[in-house]
């Protein structure tokens, strides 16, 4: 193996932790969005002592977070180049892609035209058609579905179309076929849904239970990512949390499921104890799913403080030749209008024990700078997009 500047790279994506409106925020109806800033203000100041030491407030002032006189990390912010503000777009861009057609979300449910087509092609009526929790919608509509055979269609805050059906009412094979039809229909640019999910369930009203026969119809990244290059060159690509789903398993050598942010940090810490060469990549989704979309600044702030408190464990276990990168994939300002993501800059903190004089990094024009830096470090094929900042880390 050739010698690398860093043998292991740990990449943490704090899902939706934006750091202020992007220059093109207005185009996305997100003027004034500021996830971190507004949370800190709402709390009368937020306590993030470990990210403070790394240089979080050196990127820009965050209320309650002290500016570091001698930051321990390189710090900066990144602008999203792609034309979207969803999780898949953000993550795919981090790994070297540029997405010009955004995935769509449907906070009001899916357009009548799409539902009508689905009804015609499946031969079944559709009920629901709104954002909902998968268990709550079964309680609400499960009995009606059993009586009528209508499909329960629902979405979430992500770009997803889910179809729930009782296994004794709609046989699995039929449900899977209907989901394939839905997948086909939603590739149309008007709808562009990231993922279609079959959600079979069993049981009686009041006791419905989802079964393990769930099936996902996702999209593979539209081009090769840095993860594909790493895997093909025999490096380890350990995916923690939602990462494997986001890239539809592409370029991944090991996948660890998680139940929460804290579980995600536990799994990341486990990988710090492993001997491997390559990357360990975690997505902490609770910020987004539990607090951003629900517009709960208090809960969001507490979750950030809990995450920050886990960092000393990470620092302690890091080896001299490890690199830690902390960033985000988009914003989700919990005091902004609506319930959708927000178009923002994302923070970039880059830490290693061997850095002698960390400081500011230039503004990144694309999240792909991270992918380019990782590719540069492991001497694999470079992505088409992104500029490596490896040579700036000293």
UniProtKB/Swiss-Prot annotation:
Alphabetically, the GO molecular function entries are: magnesium ion binding; manganese ion binding; phosphopentomutase activity
**Which catalytic reaction applies to this protein?**
2-deoxy-alpha-D-ribose 1-phosphate = 2-deoxy-D-ribose 5-phosphate; alpha-D-ribose 1-phosphate = D-ribose 5-phosphate
Pathway of action: Carbohydrate degradation; 2-deoxy-D-ribose 1-phosphate degradation; D-glyceraldehyde 3-phosphate and acetaldehyde from 2-deoxy-alpha-D-ribose 1-phosphate: step 1/2
Span of the signal peptide: none
Q: Does the keyword Cytoplasm apply?
A: yes
Give the UniProt entry's GO cellular component terms. cytosol
Q: Which GO terms describe its biological process?
A: 2-deoxyribose 1-phosphate catabolic process; 5-phosphoribose 1-diphosphate biosynthetic process; metabolic compound salvage; nucleotide metabolic process
Binding annotation for Mn(2+) 2 = 288, 293, 341
Q: Which UniProt keywords apply?
A: Cytoplasm, Isomerase, Manganese, Metal-binding
Q: Which domain of life is it from?
A: Bacteria
Subcellular localization is given as: Cytoplasm
| Cited function | Isomerase that catalyzes the conversion of deoxy-ribose 1-phosphate (dRib-1-P) and ribose 1-phosphate (Rib-1-P) to deoxy-ribose 5-phosphate (dRib-5-P) and ribose 5-phosphate (Rib-5-P), respectively.
Q: What protein is this chain from?
A: Phosphopentomutase
């Amino acid at each position: 193996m050739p010698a690398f500047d860093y043998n292991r790279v740990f990449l943490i994506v704090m899902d939706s932790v934006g750091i202020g409106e992007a220059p093109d925020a207005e185009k996305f109806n997100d003027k004034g969005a500021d996830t971190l800033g507004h949370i800190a203000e709402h709390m009368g100041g937020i306590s993030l002592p470990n990210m403070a030491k790394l240089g979080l407030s050196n990127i820009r002032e965050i209320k309650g977070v002290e500016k570091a006189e001698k930051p321990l990390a390189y710090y900066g912010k990144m602008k999203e180049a792609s034309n979207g503000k969803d999780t898949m777009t953000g993550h795919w861009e981090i790994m070297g892609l540029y997405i010009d057609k955004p995935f769509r979300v449907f906070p009001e449910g899916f357009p009548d035209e799409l539902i009508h087509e689905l009804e015609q092609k499946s031969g079944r009526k559709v009920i629901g058609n709104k954002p909902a929790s998968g268990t709550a919608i079964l309680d609400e509509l499960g009995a009606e579905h059993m009586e009528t055979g209508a499909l329960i269609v629902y979405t979430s805050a992500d770009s997803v179309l889910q179809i729930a059906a009782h296994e004794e009412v709609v046989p699995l094979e039929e449900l899977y076929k209907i989901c394939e039809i839905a997948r086909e229909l939603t590739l149309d640019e008007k709808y562009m849904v990231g993922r279609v999910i079959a959600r079979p369930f069993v049981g009686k009203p009041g006791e419905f239970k989802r079964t393990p026969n769930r099936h996902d119809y996702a999209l593979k990244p539209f081009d090769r990512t840095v993860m594909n290059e790493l895997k093909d060159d025999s490096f380890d690509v350990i995916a923690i949390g939602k990462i494997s789903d986001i890239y539809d398993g592409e370029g991944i050598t090991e996948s660890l499921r998680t139940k929460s942010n804290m579980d995600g940090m536990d799994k990341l810490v486990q990988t710090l104890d492993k001997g491997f060469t390559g990357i360990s990549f975690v997505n902490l989704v609770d910020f987004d799913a539990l607090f951003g979309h629900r517009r709960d600044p208090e809960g969001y702030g507490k979750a950030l403080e809990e995450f920050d408190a886990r960092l000393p464990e990470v620092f302690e276990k890091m080896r001299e030749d490890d690199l830690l990168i902390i960033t985000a994939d988009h914003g989700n300002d919990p005091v902004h209008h609506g319930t959708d993501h927000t178009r923002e800059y994302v923070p970039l903190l880059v830490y290693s024990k061997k850095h002698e004089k960390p400081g500011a990094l230039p503004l990144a024009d694309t999240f792909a700078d991270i992918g380019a830096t990782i590719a540069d470090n492991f001497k694999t094929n470079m992505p088409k997009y992104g500029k490596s900042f490896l040579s700036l880390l000293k």
